[in-house]
């Protein structure tokens, strides 16, 4: 089958031919329709330090997808040939304390599709049936293919009550932008997002941001004053991994505020702990998606009017993957979709 793989230890990916995956007793085989390019895939493309330490070579990658079940293992129940599915990209052990307690997103033995094992940038993907998730017919293939990052945004944004609250989001990547739409959809009052990328800040405005702030030109404090915010933000969603963004967030939080961290800052990042301790801030680390509560919430929000369509800005045939990665690398894109049926 055709697949997009890391064949050698260096930058780039190669469209190649690989063996179609075998299907275990508890697996489903998915014929891929669409995939989306993730920031993780950009790290793999660039072959940065993280990728060099993490990605086995050779291996085909990718973990954001939608497709159709074409084969099932003999032990699989609850699915049928022809079901349209996306799937949870974190494969968990099922035996550790968190898995057995129903907290699979906290599994200490997680294996990542397209990171630690063969991925979805291919004509077929085999995964455990437990990880597959049926997509309702009213949700398009394009939207279904971005359920993985949409789930990151949902898990982060819904970690705390947002109804009537003022929300600060630092980092206008696709996940941060989707978090804007989620926060407004569930009833936040002011949703302010910061970045230095004007293209993506404009996308955030289209997704409903109260203010999209280029912090290279505009003061967050001035924006807060314009919005008549006298006490600071109630909820912070840190999506960038940029130390200065996290610092500014802590300074802008109200006493008793709550912060969810999805962005990954450098290991030795220092912060002013006085901002945390004396403000009584609650800080929560976010990884992946809750299995499968996050997935059900994603579907429910889309079915109740959440519009994520502006975040998908580019579409290419899978054979034109280099154009897709170029769009992502330019910084002037939202989500980029690759069509494996074209």
Curated annotation (Swiss-Prot):
Residues at which Zn(2+) 1 binds: 38, 63-64
EC numbers, comma separated: 1.1.1.103
Gene3D superfamilies given in the database record: Medium-chain alcohol dehydrogenases, catalytic domain (3.90.180.10), NAD(P)-binding Rossmann-like Domain (3.40.50.720)
Any one of the GO BP annotations: L-threonine catabolic process to glycine
Ligand binding (Zn(2+) 2): 93, 96, 99, 107
Gene Ontology molecular function: any one: L-threonine 3-dehydrogenase activity
Family: Belongs to the zinc-containing alcohol dehydrogenase family.
Function: Catalyzes the NAD(+)-dependent oxidation of L-threonine to 2-amino-3-ketobutyrate.
Protein name as annotated: L-threonine 3-dehydrogenase
Organism: Burkholderia lata (strain ATCC 17760 / DSM 23089 / LMG 22485 / NCIMB 9086 / R18194 / 383)
Upper taxonomic lineage: Bacteria, Pseudomonadati, Pseudomonadota, Betaproteobacteria, Burkholderiales
């Amino acid at each position: 089958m055709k697949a997009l793989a890391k064949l050698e230890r260096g930058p780039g990916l190669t469209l190649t031919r690989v063996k179609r995956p075998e299907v275990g007793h508890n697996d489903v085989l998915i014929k891929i329709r669409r995939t989306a390019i993730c920031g993780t895939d950009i790290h793999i493309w660039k072959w940065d330090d993280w990728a060099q330490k993490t990605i086995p070579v050779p291996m085909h990658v990718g973990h954001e997808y939608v497709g159709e079940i074409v084969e099932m293992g003999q032990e699989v129940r609850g699915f049928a040939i022809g079901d349209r599915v996306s799937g949870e990209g974190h494969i968990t052990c099922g035996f550790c304390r968190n898995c057995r307690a129903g907290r699979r997103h906290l599994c200490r033995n997680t294996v990542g599709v397209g990171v630690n094992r063969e991925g979805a940038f291919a004509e077929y993907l085999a995964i455990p049936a437990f990880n597959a998730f049926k997509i309702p017919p009213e949700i398009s293939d394009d939207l279904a293919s971005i359920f993985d990052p949409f789930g990151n945004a949902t898990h982060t944004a819904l970690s705390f009550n947002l109804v009537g609250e003022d929300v600060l989001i630092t980092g206008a990547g696709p996940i941060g932008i989707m978090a804007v739409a989620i926060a407004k959809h569930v009833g936040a009052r002011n949703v302010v997002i910061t970045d230095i990328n004007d293209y993506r800040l404009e996308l955030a405005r289209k997704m409903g941001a109260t203010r999209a702030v280029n912090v290279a030109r505009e003061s967050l404090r001035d924006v807060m004053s314009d919005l008549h915010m006298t006490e600071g933000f109630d909820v912070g969603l840190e999506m960038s991994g940029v130390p200065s963004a996290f610092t500014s967030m802590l300074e802008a939080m109200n006493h008793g505020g709550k912060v969810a961290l999805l962005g990954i800052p450098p290991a030795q990042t220092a912060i002013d702990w006085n901002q945390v301790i004396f403000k009584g801030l609650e800080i929560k680390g976010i990884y992946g998606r809750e299995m499968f509560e996050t997935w059900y919430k994603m579907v429910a929000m889309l079915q109740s009017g959440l519009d994520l369509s502006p975040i998908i800005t580019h579409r290419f045939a899978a054979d034109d993957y280099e154009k897709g990665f170029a769009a992502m690398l330019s910084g002037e894109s939202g989500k980029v979709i690759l069509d494996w049926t074209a």
